[in-house]
Every structure is written in C-alpha cells, then in structure tokens.
C-alpha cells in the first residue's frame, strides 16, 4: 500500500507536485508515516483527512495562506465516542468539537476587526473552499503528544508546497501567526507576495488580540482582488 491509498490527494495537487513524489525525502516521509500507522497508537487527523487542506483548495484557487504548526492532538466525546479534534485544516476543528482557545481568539479578533459574527462551531472548511489554504507545516500527530510527528519530515514537503505556490505570478496573501510560522518568511520571494504577521493566537502568547491582523488581511485582499474575502462561517 502506498501513502495515497490511505490518504487521497486530488489530481490537481498530484499534477502540481508530481516531481516531488519520487524524491528521496518524500519517499522517506511516506515510509515513516506508513510505519507510524502500523504502531498501535492513534494518529490524527484520520488518514483520509491527511491532505484535506490541499483537497479543499486546489493550487489554482489559492489566494490566502494561513499557515499552522501541527494538528490538534486532543479528542472530544460525541455520543460516548472519542473523536479527534483535528480535521486536516490549520486552526480548524470538527464541526461538533469544542472550539480551542487559539481559535476562540481568532474569532474574537475577526469580530473586533471586521464585525464578523462569532460562529458557534470551529469548522473553517468554508474559508478553504473560498481560496484560503489552511496548511499545517507538520501534517500529522500522535494522540496527546504535541509535535510527535516532527521526525517524519513533513516540513520538507510543506515547504515545497509553499515554494511551488510562491512561484505563481498572482500575489498571494501569506498570514504567519507566531514565531514558528514566521520562520517561513525566508521561503517567500521579496516584493512578490503580501506577508502579514502577528503573534500566535494562543492565550499563552501576547499581542494577538488587538493586532488588527484581519483588518490587514482584508485590506490586502481588496487591493489584489477588488473585493472582500468572505470570512462568514
């Protein structure tokens, strides 16, 4: 069995990234991830959602990139069943999952900046379908073990995704929240794309609330696309 047998990837992205899949680094990622699936430990998100961010936002549709670090590693209960919070999109959670503190702060700042009503669920799929790539730098995680899949090497792949997108002619709006995400500035060609930075939305970080980050995103989106991005959920 190959990686894409467990984790489907759309034809558009397969064609866009075709040259990556035979490179040694990617074959090593594939090997390590498939080995991790064989161990009797729970891996999030479920393998069918591993590439959900890519599948919801084709390369030709990407207008905004909101980069995350790695998936949520926690669970929630629904009908007495333990389910993963992570769904394959950065900062987003399953429809019926409790909204995590970082996402609550995102919604608070969005409301303060643009008056967008605070939603009752944390599923950001609608943003992805409108052109916001919600990509995590690390695509998988072990249950209750933050950053546990850093060893798999996902960042080499997500960096290639970003660099391929940065080669496009249309200006992209790249939103980097926190110091870890902001390290990716080194990958972005100068004077070609719009970079917007802010502190991480975690309550453990300071400065995100009141940063005006979504005001900046909307201003940039208007400049490039002559209309507002629809942040409603």
UniProtKB/Swiss-Prot annotation:
SMART domains: UDG, UreE_C. CDD domains: UDG-F1-like. One of its GO terms (molecular function) is uracil DNA N-glycosylase activity. The active site is at residue 70. It is found in: Cytoplasm. It comes from the Bacteria. It is an enzyme of class 3 (hydrolase). Its main location: cytoplasm. One of its GO terms (biological process) is base-excision repair, AP site formation via deaminated base removal. Keywords: Cytoplasm, DNA damage, DNA repair, Hydrolase. InterPro entries: UDG_fam1, Ura-DNA_Glyclase_AS, Uracil-DNA_glycosylase-like, Uracil-DNA_glycosylase-like_sf. The keyword Protein biosynthesis does not apply. Its EC number is 3.2.2.27. GO terms for cellular component: cytoplasm. Signal peptide: none annotated. Disulfide bonds: none annotated. It catalyses: Hydrolyzes single-stranded DNA or mismatched double-stranded DNA and polynucleotides, releasing free uracil. Belongs to the uracil-DNA glycosylase (UDG) superfamily. UNG family. HAMAP family: UDG. Excises uracil residues from the DNA which can arise as a result of misincorporation of dUMP residues by DNA polymerase or due to deamination of cytosine. PANTHER family: URACIL-DNA GLYCOSYLASE. This is Uracil-DNA glycosylase. It comes from Helicobacter pylori (strain ATCC 700392 / 26695). The lineage of its organism: Bacteria, Pseudomonadati, Campylobacterota, Epsilonproteobacteria, Campylobacterales.
